Amino acid sequence: MDVAVKKVEVRQLKKGKYIMIDDEPCKIVEYTTSSPGKHGSAKARIVAVGLFDGKKRTLTKPVDAKVDVPVIERKTAQVVSDMGDTVQLMDMETYETFEVQKPEDEELASQLEPGTMVEYMEAAGKRKIVGIKEEE
């Protein structure tokens, strides 16, 4: 799978940013560093939640280590059809059609009718609806 990532030093990360842990794009919810001891450099402890699976993951690395950060794109699509657990979307720039899981948020899922414009995020080859696109 061709995943768009960039290499970043651990010291450049902070809460709210994104990181790849176990090949899953995650949002950092906790970032703590321990001061360097007699031997070795400072270490960072990162707690992050998977963007697509919601699982909590922990990573401990030296602050000068390089880690992968996912390239996350936010795009606009139109709902083509409701297919039960999934909805078919059409990207408004490329006109590509694809299926995505319905969001777990019941209020958001109930608004997904054919013709509705939605905002979705794409990272690591996965897609997820993040909200309804308001009319401008």
Curated annotation (Swiss-Prot):
Protein name stated in the entry: Translation initiation factor 5A
Pfam families: eIF-5a (PF01287), IF5A-like_N (PF21485)
Similarity comment text for this entry: Belongs to the eIF-5A family.
GO MF assignments: ribosome binding; RNA binding; translation elongation factor activity; translation initiation factor activity
One GO location term (cellular component): cytoplasm
Gene: eif5a
Cytoplasm in keyword set: yes
GO BP terms: positive regulation of translational elongation; positive regulation of translational termination
